[in-house]
């Protein structure tokens, strides 16, 4: 559909939304200054906070959120598509959403996406996470047409659920977006391979803006923001823990070409799953007949 420059912004968001908004604006301006027509920020751009009491004072409804207001203004001023990877939003029902926003070059809100899969895990290093205790999961995938490309939306832990990305690719997505705040431990093990796999298996670009470094609340995120092409080649990569901007050219014709070379979207078949037991020979004989 088009050729354009895309930017992924790496941040180290702290507990104070106001300070994060200042860094957010500076980095967005840098990205636009480098020619990016689409700019993506990481998950939890607004604030990274573990303490429940601090969250209660920091999280705001959409209409009074600082990052949302800044993004609306900046997208119009700079004439860019600005994708806030996510920020915590207090919903009308009192629940909290981990919500992404896409603003158009005229400042209009083009799309929202709420993170679907909650990160509820216990890691080997003692870290324990229960996102479902704080956030209300979304229930709808999203593909947004921005003229230059069709974007498929995801946030962080969604990356581990390939069916989401396949559904978006089948719906026309040529660029898969994965703003994230991966832990250092899981990022070292899985970040690069998962992002490249999602690109390869769907014949799509992947843009993944990340949080990186040691945060005020004690957590450490992996960084390494990436832009990957449909063949799995890394086009741009950020450092582990330094805030900054990476930029790469996106040519959606490369997505069409990758899908022509490896037409797995077209070749996919529905199938059933048989279940047998090696300890029940009769069942095995039945499956073979």
Residue ranges and their predicted role:
Residues 17-18, 25-106, 112-114, 183-198:
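Cys-nucleophile CN-hydrolase/nitrilase-fold catalytic domain and related Cys-dependent amidase chemistry
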Residues 84, 99-102, 142-144, 225-227, ...:
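Short beta-strand scaffold segments in enzyme catalytic cores
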Residues 62-83, 150, 156-245:
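CN hydrolase (nitrilase-like) catalytic-core segments centered on the catalytic cysteine
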Residues 91-171, 184-193, 261-264:
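Active-site catalytic loop in hydrolytic enzyme cores
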Residues 42, 116-119, 179, 210:
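Conserved residues at the C-terminal ends of beta-strands
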Residues 112, 210-289:
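C-terminal beta-strand edge segments of enzyme domains
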Residues 19-28, 160-166:
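Short, acidic/polar
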Residues 3-15, 40, 99, 112-114, ...:
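Active-site-proximal beta-strand elements of phosphoester/diester hydrolases
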């Amino acid at each position: 559909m088009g050729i354009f420059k895309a930017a992924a912004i790496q941040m180290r968001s702290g507990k104070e939304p106001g300070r994060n908004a200042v860094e957010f604006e500076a980095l967005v301006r840098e990205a636009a200054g480098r020619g990016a027509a689409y700019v993506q920020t990481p998950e939890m751009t607004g604030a990274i906070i573990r303490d429940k009491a601090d969250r209660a004072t920091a999280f705001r409804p959409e209409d009074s959120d600082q990052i949302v207001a800044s993004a609306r203004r900046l997208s119009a001023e700079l004439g860019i598509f600005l994708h806030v990877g996510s920020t915590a939003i207090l919903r009308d029902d009192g629940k909290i959403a981990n919500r992404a926003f896409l603003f158009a070059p005229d400042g209009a809100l083009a799309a929202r996406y709420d993170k679907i899969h909650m990160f509820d895990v216990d890691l080997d290093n003692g870290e324990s996470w229960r996102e479902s205790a704080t956030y209300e999961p979304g229930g709808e995938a999203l593909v947004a047409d921005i003229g230059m490309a069709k974007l498929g939306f995801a946030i962080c832990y969604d990356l581990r659920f390939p069916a989401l990305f396949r559904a978006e690719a089948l719906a026309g997505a040529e660029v898969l977006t994965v703003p994230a705040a991966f832990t250092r431990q899981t990022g070292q093990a899985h970040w690069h391979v998962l992002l490249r796999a999602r690109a390869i298996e769907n014949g799509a670009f992947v843009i993944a803006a990340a949080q990186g470094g040691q945060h005020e609340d004690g957590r450490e995120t992996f960084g390494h923001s990436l832009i990957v092409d449909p063949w799995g080649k890394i086009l741009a990569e950020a450092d582990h823990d330094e805030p900054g901007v990476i930029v790469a050219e996106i040519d959606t014709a490369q997505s069409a070409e990758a899908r022509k070379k490896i037409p797995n979207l077209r070749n996919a078949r529905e199938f059933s799953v048989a279940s047998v037991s090696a300890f029940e020979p009769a069942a095995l004989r039945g499956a073979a007949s």
